[in-house]
Curated annotation (Swiss-Prot):
This is E3 ubiquitin-protein ligase SHPRH. The keyword Transferase applies. Changing residue 1222 to D: Found in a renal cell carcinoma sample; somatic mutation. Changing residue 267 to A: Found in a patient with autosomal recessive hearing loss; uncertain significance. Pfam families: Helicase_C, Linker_histone, SHPRH_helical-1st, SHPRH_helical-2nd, SNF2-rel_dom, zf-RING_UBOX. It catalyses: S-ubiquitinyl-[E2 ubiquitin-conjugating enzyme]-L-cysteine + [acceptor protein]-L-lysine = [E2 ubiquitin-conjugating enzyme]-L-cysteine + N(6)-ubiquitinyl-[acceptor protein]-L-lysine. Changing residue 1146 to T: Found in a patient with autosomal recessive hearing loss; uncertain significance. It comes from Homo sapiens.
């Protein structure tokens, strides 16, 4: 009973006390003003806009009401006088803002304003106006009456708005008036005036009426990005202006439902697409076409049918054929014209409330539309007829022709001969031997190298060497000392500075004294000197310097290097010149000098420079300068006579020379012709930009970026965009239907393959065909800024290569056609975005199924067509789709009828004369093995789908309304079941990948038996675990006899299932050991058995058997380690440990002064091709010279040998039988730690030694065990029972020490050191490999020893049973499983009893399935002749050739089964029977009937080789029957999954049937052509998603659908491949369905959906067809049938 005292009953409090207990939150703020935020977007929250509730202001606050704080933009409101008592009990009365509108007298000023309308203020009879009223400002305020207002007249000339302290200087008593506007509307006007969007002016008419003019100010005009601009949420200003305009001009939106925020758009229950198509057809029939043209073009081979002529005529009408588009600028659909009383024209949008001054032009007339003729009616021919009939006449040639007075600069380096010289002519030319080879001076080369290769860390000396060697072909090896001396001089002069390191091992950058002119100025000073002085300096330099400054002569490189000039006699040069005159006339030029990036020319130290007056080319010579000048001038004069000067001049000497090509090559002298952009003057390779030399005087050249930025080039070409699968089909159709040479056709493959095609080249074509894949990829090449433009990236140096933009946007296409246009119906996909960016006159969407999920899909096509305003999503939804959803389809239907043409097969069937199409359904039955597999999958999938569907509350939702991830998740079980109906191996994740081999049914049966056996062992393990646990509970409770009986039950169960199952040996050991302990204790009540004496021996055998595996592993690991250790001893004997070979090599390198090369080689080997570990200092950064390398290697080798010795000793100490101390320490340390491993036992210590040794021997990328557990502690991950690492934690990469040794050995070999050094080094490398092998085997040996100790601990744990914690024993933390609290005993007993019941039931079920599969295997045994000798358990007769198998595995003859079914069926619908042996329930549909006799039906007796699934075998048999009945007939096989097609292809190969398969894009066209043309290939395997769109395969007459297709439009597309115009034979559709599976349910559901949608041709996907309830129904009904 509760200890609380009884309380008194509640008593009603009197009124006075209630008043005392009441608290008013506004009491303390009675006279305090409330600051209400004045947001420009939203009205004041909580305010009531009706005029009936205004707050009367107190006199002290009247002046503050109208005050507007410009900084805070707030409204000041106060509460009225104290609230009455009865009001305090109720809800606080609503607030409202005081009406306060200032109306000024009208005066003329220069500001723009437009008169919108006026409102009338009528004075009451007793009121009158004062004198000069029209010259005064008035304030309109609300009164106590909701229908009347007060006006206050201000002093004359008083500016009420500009006064801040006293804005309402009331000069007289308020005048009562009535307004033509409501109080709410007046409030809106006040808000608009306060925001300075409108202005109110008063104009009295008589003594009793005041007219108030509403004027729109310039700030009230809308600023729109485009005319159809519509924000998803209207601003407050627009909302109020809309109300005002409706009041003034009655501008209510015509015939359109207003937006209802509370009622969002909802998809209609059923969208009848046929109703839309019927409306379109009726509309076109009622129209009279203004154009009737004979569209049968002479170049068109096929004769157009009447419906095709009508379609082409309609398309011509849409393109305004023989009539120009309307030139009058029509008013935009969304806007209305308003003319003010002053004659000013404004334009108002009644949908958004926006007003503008500019005329809203509706834009160009729509040219194009949607051609939606049904599949197979010849849309391709109709488009070709349109292209041939209507060509563009007004092509502007300005962009395609070269402007007057301009010449394209086209330059070819001189070594490139336009025409080849004959061999005899070359022999006649006598060349003198080269006298001298020149190159830039060393200081120029070094400064150029430092400048060009400068980075964040500077330039190393090696980088300078590489640059000088590769660019100038300078002999660095020979002249290294000269380069070093020059570098020291440059550092001393301040032109170069060292930023890192010491000596030449550091890095360098340009110094503070360096200037851009240094390179050329220095060389010019040297070049200006007289030849005599130069020769003198050359002689002084000596032979060594001369050899270092000049490269060795090599005739093979002479012509390739522009820096070396060879000087010949005038006679020989003149002979060569005569041969080269023709090529010079074509625009070729003389040798030139390669400028640097700044346009300067590198000069030579021993040459004079002479500028030729007639050109900018430079002729360089060491002697005879005058003669050379004459030769150069003479040569250029010849060129000038025929070619414009810009073509012959070398561009490299000009200051504005820039070269940047799309090929990415650097600006080096090559033999490729170059061309210059007329706009940005950029030079590029002519071939790279597809500019032909023959167009020099005809076509202008602009670089790709300039072309894209210019106005598009107008052309008469038609761009056709098609799927990849039918791209080549377009070419075939054009070749077949159009006479040769009538059309020029180009298949464009994108800038990746074709490069940048010149727009004038595209403009010369009649048809350009691209694929959607190319179109999608071209989007990446549209908005690429010019690298040197303002939008491009600003780089320190010029970019190496130019990114290529897409040329498609540089052309104004005459016509753009989207074939299979449903691919762009989603306007967010890349292909749709690119299609919208293309510039075109006529736009066409071509699709037999323009509607996929619903009518909202048409929006993507409307966006491509660019039809305003419906190409904006807001207007599409508001004006068309929302009314359609609300049962008002007229607007949408009328709009679509204007842009869409549709001809259906049923309407023109008499014109096309296509033979009929029939359908044949093949109902199949699973084999027993497949049925068992399917039932397993169904059980798992049902559980999965129930769990997922529970998360969805509303099952009436369509799957299309859910997000994609959820839909994929809940459809996945359905997908698995559908795949299981085709082939077990098609189910993902069930078996090995198909690449290995296709599984036969025998292999499937074997796999199922193994799985079932594993499941039986798992169920038996759970049962034994429960029995052992219950025995422990009985021992705790003192019930020893029951415990012994349970242990004996475990041993009996183990013996009973000995032949079928494998019992866990540790569980048997647990039962044997504890039973033996009970018997030794001699507890009363335990009966003896004959087996009691053998328990000790059995326990010993179990222990020995368990330990034998571990002992064997230890012995094998030790045996594998021994030969490797022997090899190591042999290698070590060959190496001199006192004087290592690498030490001798280092000493020799120092002795020969090649130590720097050795150091650099070692560093390169360490740093190259290996990723450095982050946060770790590399070995290459620890030494600078050979002395440091020597010390580092010595230290590391000593540490390596030390770690190696420690690891070997640690492993050696672990050998032998483990002692009790070792086992106990390992148990406490890591086998059974309290929380985290302690790493204190000998095994863990050895593991740390292994980690250390591994970091020395291999690349240090491993992580030790301690570090791993430290991270776990930091992350607070808790227990880590199974997280102890067992092997290495990183990659076994080559260590830096070994790589250094390899580099030293390579250095010794290259410099041919002593052979004994090299041999010893090779032996040392072999020793490293042996050490690594030893490490791996040593670690495996350590693991085997560790596992042996772990096995000993496992045996000790296996004998422990449940026990109660002793009161004196501390509570374990974390809890230990076998130690329980006293109060948990009964709880654990109940849990174990439940586990026992579940495990017993599961074991019985799985054993039945295993027996069932075993009997199935017997039925497939052909050695017995198909006769089962076993007797029937009921009638004892031989089963023979026909019997029945239940799911429990027991077999009965057919007669006994029929009696049991008729007389002894059980269940709610009497649909199940119980086995006569085990009493397990089996559904009637789950009974398998085995027939081993030959089939009597000869028609089905077509042998199919191989063991395949039921469906695959049926498909192959059907294909074989087709060939038997109609040899040569071709068939298409469609499947949703590529894996299923691969399985079918394997079956066809086994049966020697020729076929073609389309699986990859690359072989698509090749395989398709082979199927069409090769009479031996009569089968084509097609995936549904790629092979069902747009293909024309009328060669085939049979279509095989392997599985039911949830998307009816995909099915229509697949069938439409053969049933189309041009087909001359009857076609047959074959469907393959499995009885009593998900396929039967799906077929029934799809038929019902088809009838309910009135055969709608809408394209429904799985998500749009199914609801959540439908999906649940698919599984639940089938489950009921199975049960």
């Amino acid at each position: 009973m509760s200890s609380r005292r009884k309380r008194a009953p509640p008593v009603r409090v009197d009124e006075e006390k209630r008043q005392q207990l009441h608290w008013n939150m506004h009491e303390d703020r009675r006279n305090e003003p409330i600051i209400i935020s004045d947001d420009d977007e939203q009205p004041c929250p909580g305010s009531d806009t009706s005029s009936a509730h205004y707050i009367i202001l107190s006199d002290s606050l009247k002046e503050e009401v109208a005050h507007r704080d410009k900084k805070r933009c707030s409204k000041v409101v106060s509460f009225s006088k104290p609230i009455e008592k009865e009001e305090t009990v109720g809800i606080f009365s609503p607030l409202s803002v005081k009406l306060n509108i200032v109306i000024s007298p009208y005066h003329f000023d220069n500001s723009w304003k437009a008169f919108l309308g006026e409102l009338t203020l009528q004075l009451l009879p007793a009121q009158s106006l004062i004198e000069n009223f029209s010259e005064r400002s008035i304030t309109l305020m609300s009164s106590e009456s909701s229908n009347q207002f007060l006006i206050y007249v201000h002093s004359k000339g008083e500016d009420v708005e500009k006064q801040k302290k006293e804005p309402m200087s009331i000069c007289d008593k308020g005048i009562l008036v009535e307004s033509s506007f409501s109080g709410e509307m007046l409030e809106d006007l006040g808000w608009l005036q306060k925001k300075r969007r409108i202005k109110l002016y008063q104009k009295p008419e008589g003594n009793h009426i005041i007219k108030v003019g509403i004027y729109l100010l310039e700030a009230g005009l809308a600023k729109l990005d485009f005319l159809s601009d519509a924000n998803s949420r209207m601003k407050k200003f627009n909302q109020l202006m809309k109300k005002v305009m409706e009041k003034l001009h009655n501008s209510i939106i015509p015939d359109v439902l207003e937006e209802d925020e509370d009622d969002p758009e909802s998809e209609p229950e059923g969208q009848d697409i046929d109703e839309l198509y019927h409306f379109v057809k009726q509309t076109h029939q009622q129209e009279t076409q203004s154009i009737q043209v004979d569209v049968q073009h002479p170049a068109l081979i096929p004769v157009l049918r009447p419906y095709q002529r009508e379609a082409v005529n309609w398309m011509l009408q849409q393109e305004c054929f023989r009539s120009s588009p309307a030139t009058e600028s029509a008013l935009h659909f969304l806007w209305r014209e308003i003319v003010t009383s002053e004659g000013l024209k404004l334009y108002y949008n009644p949908y958004t409330g926006c007003i503008i001054r500019e005329y809203p032009n509706s834009g160009p007339q729509l040219l194009g539309g949607i051609l939606a003729d049904e599949m197979g009616l010849g849309k391709t021919v109709e488009v070709l007829a349109l292209i041939l009939t209507h060509t563009r006449q007004d092509v502007k040639q300005d962009a395609l022709t070269l402007p007057e007075g301009k010449v394209v600069n086209y330059f070819i380096p001189s070594h490139y001969f336009g025409g080849k010289l004959k061999k005899t002519e070359i022999q006649n030319i006598e060349f003198e031997p080269k006298e001298k080879v020149q190159c830039p001076p060393t200081r120029v080369m070094i400064l150029t190298a430092v400048k060009e290769m400068n980075g964040k860390k500077g330039v190393s000396i090696l980088s300078i060497y590489k640059y000088v060697s590769s660019i100038y072909r300078y002999d660095v090896q020979r002249n290294r000392s000269l380069l070093k001396r020059m570098l020291k001089c440059l550092i001393f002069e301040g032109l170069v500075k060292q930023i890192k390191g010491h000596g030449f091992s550091g890095t360098f950058t340009l110094g503070k004294n360096y200037k851009e002119e240094d390179i050329c100025d220095k060389t010019k000073k040297q070049a200006v000197g007289s030849p005599r002085k130069i020769q003198k300096e050359t002689r002084k330099s000596g032979n060594k310097d001369t050899d270092s400054e000049y490269l060795p002569s090599d005739t093979s490189d002479d012509d390739d290097d522009p820096y070396y000039y060879y000087y010949k006699s005038r006679r020989n040069r003149s002979k060569l010149r005569k041969k080269l005159v023709p090529s010079t006339k074509k625009g070729k030029s003389q040798p030139f000098i390669n400028p640097d990036s700044q346009g300067h020319c590198p000069a030579t130290s021993d040459s004079g420079i002479t500028d030729v007056a007639m050109s900018k080319s430079t002729c360089i010579s060491e002697f005879n300068q005058e003669h050379e000048t004459e030769d150069c001038a003479e040569s250029l004069n010849h060129a000038d006579s025929d070619v414009p000067p810009s073509n012959t001049m070398s561009p490299f000497n000009t200051s504005d020379y820039r070269f940047e090509c799309i090929c990415g090559e650097l600006d080096q002298i090559d033999r490729k012709p170059r061309v210059q952009c007329l706009k940005c003057h950029l030079w590029q390779h002519a071939k790279c930009v597809n500019y032909d030399e023959k167009n020099l005087k005809i076509k202008p050249f602009y670089c790709p970026h300039c072309l894209v930025a210019m106005e598009p080039v107008s052309t008469r070409a038609t761009l056709i965009i098609s799927p990849s699968s039918i791209c080549h089909q377009w070419v075939d159709e054009i070749n077949r239907h159009v006479r040769s040479s009538s059309l020029r056709v180009l298949v464009y493959q994108g800038v990746k393959k074709d490069g940048f095609l010149q727009p004038h080249f595209l403009a010369e074509q009649d048809i350009v065909i691209i694929t959607y894949d190319v179109l999608r990829s071209e989007l990446n090449y549209v908005d690429i800024p010019h690298s040197n433009s303002e939008d491009g990236r600003r780089l320190r140096n010029q970019k190496r290569y130019m990114a290529i933009p897409s040329p498609l946007v540089a052309v104004e296409w005459w016509r753009i056609c989207l074939d299979e246009a449903q691919m762009v119906e989603c306007p967010t996909v890349k292909a749709a975005e690119m299609a919208q960016r293309l510039s075109g006159i006529n736009r066409w969407c071509i699709s037999g199924t323009p509607v996929q999920r619903g009518l909202e899909d048409l929006f993507g096509l409307v966006v491509f067509l660019g039809i305003e305003p419906y190409c904006v999503k807001h207007w599409w939804v508001r004006l068309l789709y929302r009314p359609y959803c609300k049962k008002n389809p007229q607007h949408l239907y009328s709009f679509i009828a204007k842009i869409l043409w549709r001809s259906a097969k049923k309407d023109v069937i008499d014109q096309i004369q296509i033979p009929p199409q029939t359908e044949e359904i093949h109902w199949l039955h699973f084999s027993p093995v497949e049925r068992h597999f399917y039932h397993r999958q169904h059980e798992v999938c049902c559980q999965d789908v129930v769990v997922k569907l529970r998360k969805i509350s509303d099952w009436a939702l369509k799957l299309s309304s859910l997000d994609r991830r959820t839909v994929t998740s809940i459809l996945y079980p359905l997908l698995r079941l559908r795949q299981a109906c085709c082939h077990p191996q098609a189910v993902r994740g069930e078996f090995l990948p198909l690449q290995k081999s296709t599984m036969t049914m025998e292999e499937l049966l074997t796999s199922l038996q193994k799985k079932c056996g594993t499941e039986c062992e798992e169920a038996h393990r759970q049962l034994v675990c429960a029995l052992n646990g219950l025995a422990g509970i009985h021992i705790i409770k003192g019930e020893y006899a029951l415990a012994a009986e349970l242990y004996r039950e475990v041993l009996r169960s183990s013996e009973e299932h000995k032949g079928k199952l494998k019992t866990d040996s540790l569980q048997r050991l647990h039962a044997t050991h504890n039973l033996m302990e009970l018997l030794i204790a001699r507890h009363p009540g335990i009966p003896p058995t004959l087996r009691d004496g053998r328990l000790e021996e059995e326990a010993k055998q179990l222990r020995e058997h368990y330990m034998s595996k571990c002992n064997t592993e230890v012995a094998e690991a030790q045996q594998a380690l021994y030969p490797v250790q022997q090899t190591i001893h042999e290698l070590q004997r060959k190496i001199h440990s006192n004087s290592p070979w690498w030490l001798n090599v280092i000493h020799r390198a120092i002795e020969f002064t090649i130590d720097e090369e050795l150091v650099q080689r070692v560093r390169n080997e360490i740093t190259s091709n290996y990723k450095q570990q982050t946060g770790k200092l590399s070995m290459s950064e620890k030494f600078r010279d050979c002395r440091g390398l020597q010390f580092l290697l010595t230290t590391q080798m000593e540490e390596l040998n030390k770690c190696q010795k420690l690891v070997r000793e640690a492993v050696k100490n672990l050998e032998g039988p483990p002692s009790r101390n070792v086992i106990e320490s390992a148990t406490v340390c890591h086998l059974r730690p309290a929380r985290l491993p302690l790493n204190c036992c000998v095994f863990c210590k050895a593991d740390e030694l292994f980690t250390e040794y591994e970091s020395k021997l291999f690349s240090n990328t491993v992580k030790g065990q301690t570090a791993i557990f430290e991270e776990m502690i930091e992350d607070e991950e808790g227990l880590v029972d199974d997280r102890a690492p067992t092997t290495t934690r990183g990659l076994w990469a080559i260590s830096e020490t070994e790589r250094s040794m390899k580099a030293i050995l390579s250095f010794a070999k290259s410099h041919r050191f002593d052979v004994e050094f090299v041999d010893e080094g090779s032996t040392s490398m072999d020793l490293f490999e042996a050490w690594k092998k030893e490490y791996k085997l040593l670690h495996e040996y350590w693991m085997a020893l560790r596992n042996r100790v772990s096995a000993v601990d496992e045996l000790a744990m296996a004998t422990e049973r449940l026990r109660v914690r002793d009161p004196r024993e501390p509570k374990p933390n974390p809890p230990v499983l076998h130690i329980i609290e006293p109060h948990e005993v009964e709880q654990n007993r109940i849990k174990l009893l439940n586990d026992k019941a579940v495990a017993t039931s599961q074991l019985q079920k799985k054993l039945g399935q295993l027996l069932y599969l075993t009997n199935l295997e017997k039925s497939q045994d052909k050695t017995s002749g198909g006769v089962n000798p076993e007797p029937c358990p009921i009638c004892a007769r031989q089963l023979g050739k026909q019997w029945a198998v239940l799911t429990c595995g027991h077999c009965f003859c057919n007669e006994c089964i029929s009696i049991i079914i008729e007389q002894y069926s059980v269940g709610s619908h009497r649909s199940s029977i119980k086995c006569a042996i085990c009493r397990q329930t089996t559904s009637h549909k789950e009974i398998s009937y085995v027939f081993t006799s030959e089939k009597a039906n000869q028609e089905e007796d077509i042998p199919v080789k191989g063991s395949h699934s039921t469906k695959v075998e049926a498909v192959v048999r059907t294909l074989m029957k087709i060939q038997l009945r109609d040899p040569g007939a071709k068939a298409l096989v469609f499947s949703t999954w590529q894996d299923v097609l691969d399985i079918i292809s394997k079956a066809l190969t086994d049966n020697n049937m020729e076929f073609a398969q389309i699986s990859r894009v690359k072989t698509f066209q090749e395989n398709l052509s082979a199927f069409k043309r090769d009479p031996q290939i009569n089968i084509l395997l097609l995936p549904l998603h790629t092979g069902s769109n747009g293909l024309t395969i009328i060669e085939a007459t049979h279509v095989l659908l392997v599985e039911p297709i949830l998307n009816p439009a995909h099915e229509l597309q697949a069938i439409g491949r053969v049933h189309r115009i041009g087909q001359t034979k009857p076609t047959i559709v074959h469907r393959f369905l499995i009885k009593a599976t998900i396929e039967e349910r799906m077929q029934a559901m799809l038929k019902t959906a088809e009838r309910s949608h009135t055969n709608s041709s809408a394209k429904h996907s799985e998500a749009s067809v199914l609801t959540v309830a439908d999906l649940a129904d698919l599984f639940t009904k089938e489950t009921e049938e199975l049960e």
